[in-house]
A protein has these predicted regions:
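N-proximal, solvent-exposed amphipathic alpha-helical segments enriched in charged/polar residues
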Residues: 1-31, 68
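Short, non-transmembrane amphipathic alpha-helical segments
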Residues: 5-8, 29, 36-41, 45-75
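Short, basic phosphate-binding NTP loop
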Residues: 27, 74-98
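Walker A/P-loop phosphate-binding motif and the immediately C-terminal alpha-helix
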Residues: 100-137, 251
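Phosphate-binding loop that captures ATP/GTP phosphates
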Residues: 123-185, 191-199
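Switch/coupling sub-region of P-loop NTPases
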Residues: 169-224, 235, 244
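Conserved catalytic-core segment of NTP-binding enzymes
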Residues: 207-208, 214-315
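C-terminal boundary of histidine-terminating zinc-finger modules
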Residues: 315-326
């Protein structure tokens, strides 16, 4: 029986993408199938970063193709192509930045900044081009967490070059003021400074810009949510009732301005004693998971109250780079992958494909 495209595609459909739960044929990720006698070749284009998984995908797809009678040699080329996805209506995308993801919390002290930096590093580790904007004007922490000192350079006196470490571009007000200097600014001034940090930084072709939002739902957060083209937001909370109450306010804020929630991270979900291994739910159990179910959001996962996460962030080497194959780093990487896959499934942004239309009165 002659080897046919239909037979091959049927075999390739048996291989599921574990990130989407769908096969590569149905999602149209598999392209350019070529049959030349017993030689078969095809491309797979992933819409999300998955560098650590590509070898496994290739092996499974080649095995599926070779299970078909008449197939001798298989060439599978797997690449990643991350594109811009739609943001809030009426807000133009930033040049050089494809997707902006806000990491937010209703209150401080729930581990939002630590989550933001590790998500950024996890996306970069999987092959994405990533930037990190420290939007917490009053309490910038990303310079310390990313182990970066010094001030940004400016080549034209008007824009700034982003700082960089661990393959991630970073900008923060913390680079522009002394470490112990308090930012005693009113809301409009802080908001203006933040917009300048965002728009006057020469970001270099980013797939994702992670924005470490200020805690709460005040003027700065609302203005940012309305003016910054956000692909989506990740909510960070602890299981504690008071934290969940404030997290709900953050969710409502994003809903009102049309920013979709990509998922919820439950931080400090459990404490495991380092001496005896006793498990204790200091802040309550499964509060974040229950809230995600209540609001129909994706539950991205839970992180324990872990001293190593804190020590690594304080030392300027966050968990994902300090212990990349450790249990905590793998949790962050799984969360980042879920976020990226959720973004890849969103509507694409085609605004750059259409010419702008200007209407003027005849003179």
């Amino acid at each position: 029986m002659a080897l046919t495209e239909q037979t091959l595609l049927a075999a390739l459909q048996t291989v599921l993408d574990p990130n989407t739960g769908k096969d590569f044929v149905t999602t149209k990720a598999l392209k350019n199938l070529q049959i030349n006698g017993g030689d078969v070749s095809f491309d797979v284009v992933l819409g999300y970063p998955a560098k650590s998984q590509i070898a496994g995908f290739r092996k499974a797809l080649i095995a599926a193709a070779k299970s078909v009678t008449g197939v001798d040699n298989v060439s599978a080329n797997i690449t990643m192509n991350i594109v811009a996805h739609a943001a809030q209506r009426g807000v133009a995308l930033l040049p050089q930045v494809k997707n902006i993801v806000a990491v937010a919390s209703g209150k401080g002290g729930v581990g939002k900044s630590t989550t933001a930096v590790n998500l950024a590093l996890a996306l970069a580790a999987e092959g994405a081009k990533v930037g990190l904007l420290d939007a917490d004007i009053y309490g910038p922490s990303q310079p310390m967490m990313m182990g970066i000192e010094g001030r940004p350079e400016s080549e034209d006196g008007q824009t700034m070059e982003p700082m960089e470490n661990y393959g991630v571009q970073v900008m923060s007000i913390g680079f522009l003021v002394n470490q112990d200097e308090a930012m005693i600014w009113r809301g409009p001034m802080a908001t203006q400074a933040l917009e300048q940090l965002l728009r006057q930084t020469n970001w270099k072709e980013l797939d994702y810009l992670i924005v470490d939002m200020p805690p709460g739902t005040g003027d700065i957060q609302l203005t940012l949510s309305q003016r910054v083209p956000m692909t989506g937001a990740v909510i960070v909370t602890t299981p504690q009732d008071i934290a969940l109450l404030d997290a709900k306010k953050g969710i409502k804020m994003f809903e009102k301005v049309g920013v979709p929630i990509l998922g919820l991270v439950e931080n400090m979900a459990v404490h495991v004693c380092t001496n005896c291994g006793h498990v204790e739910h200091i802040f309550g159990a499964d509060g974040g998971k229950k809230m995600a179910a209540e609001y129909g959001m994706d539950y991205l996962g839970a992180l324990p109250l872990n001293m190593q996460i804190r020590l690594q962030a304080d030392s300027g080497k966050p968990t994902v780079v300090s212990d990349p194959d450790g249990e905590m780093a793998l949790i962050y990487k799984a969360m980042a992958r879920l976020v990226a896959v959720k973004i890849a499934a969103k509507a694409k942004d085609f605004s750059s494909k259409f010419p702008s239309i200007k209407i003027s009165k005849d003179t």
